[in-house]
Amino acid sequence: LYDADQGILLSGDHVLPSITPHVSGVGNGADALKSYIATLDLVADLPGVRLGLPAHGHPFEDVPGRVDAIKRHHEERMHLLQQVSSSLGAATVQQLSREIFPKKHWGVMAESETFAHLEHMVLAGEAERREEHGRLLYEVAPPS
């Protein structure tokens, strides 16, 4: 919800000031991460945004800058998946997630976000998914 006259964006959980919103890959089979990034771009393109009002945390001023930071976070997460996959080889979502979130395992949230990144990379041709013995295994292409 955006009040263009006042430059105030009710960003809810979509853009948060200090944490990245959870992107779940569980759903209708679409590329959840690609969809989320596309909507972030729409928010960044809103003219004259002065203030973001999030569902969590304090109001914040640099909405386009925060959008850029969230997008960078997801790029960094995919780069980390490339690194982890190169050392593990083909692995399950759970195995990859535990490597990416080693200090504090966030359980299902971490796994569903890892799944969203992996599925995005599969659809972009940057990773492969296969089934072996009833388990989905992912292998991410090394950085080019």
Question: Which ranges hold each PLM region?
Answer:
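C-terminal regulatory/interaction regions
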Residues: 80-144
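Metallo-beta-lactamase
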Residues: 1-78
